[in-house]
Amino acid sequence: MAGWRTVVVNIHSKLSYKNNHLIFRNSYKTEMIHLSEIDILLLETTDIVLTTMLVKRLVDENILVIFCDDKRLPTAFLTPYYARHDSSLQIARQIAWKENVKCEVWTAIIAQKILNQSYYLGECSFFEKSQSIMELYHGLERFDPSNREGHSARIYFNTLFGNDFTRESDNDINAALDYGYTLLLSMFAREVVVCGCMTQIGLKHANQFNQFNLASDIMEPFRPIIDRIVYQNRHNNFVKIKKELFSIFSETYLYNGKEMYLSNIVSDYTKKVIKALNQLGEEIPEFRI
């Protein structure tokens, strides 16, 4: 059974391994956490020493490890080369995915994202703008040749954060959005690898400098989870918003009629998307905020 705890380490310390436990040591105390309890390990400072045996065991247990830079921003995460015995078979399937199937799956995923943006604006009582995005949703075509996704995003972010807001601006709002999206991306990248796929080969994302094109495609409907937290805390500074973003690891969300932790939803959603792409009879899953 997968772990459930998100462990955040943000002070000078040493992390090591002993008898299936992560050992935390600093000048003041020593603590032990059984690996079976850990789902995510967030290393929020560069002032941490890890043993290679611990790293090896974290990979064995499929624990998501996120590394932060000297500004405490996520900069990398640990993923194994192969997370299942038949990864070569799955990679061969991935390379052979039919263009029309990729188009159908990608369009369904983006439709969910646009719909969730509309729903969230309605939740915030921006009913006119919500309806404008809903109209874009109803006019969405395969692979979105008219860029309705982009038009929706512009309406959405300008409604939430003001007409002068752009995603290129250097401010606390964008820093928080990027931080939250990176947390999401790391969760999806882990599940992509667990499914035996290469993270680099996406559906529509094809940036040669993006190592996580497929995870970037699949995570799209989940972005409004981050947007909601940032919007609710928009008057706070980045440090405060960042702390609130950690709630995505402990909150539950409605999925398939059940309240579930986000990591479990991400796992199920990703598996079903991959099965749909493999044409194994799985319907494209839905996620609604």
Swiss-Prot record:
Keywords: Antiviral defense, DNA-binding, Endonuclease, Hydrolase, Magnesium, Manganese, Metal-binding, Nuclease. Signal peptide: none annotated. It is an enzyme of class 3 (hydrolase). One of its GO terms (molecular function) is DNA endonuclease activity. Disruption phenotype: Plasmid transformation is still inhibited. Mn(2+) binds at residues 149, 205, 220. One of its GO terms (biological process) is maintenance of CRISPR repeat elements. Belongs to the CRISPR-associated endonuclease Cas1 family. Homodimer, forms a heterotetramer with a Cas2 homodimer. This is CRISPR-associated endonuclease Cas1. It comes from Streptococcus thermophilus.
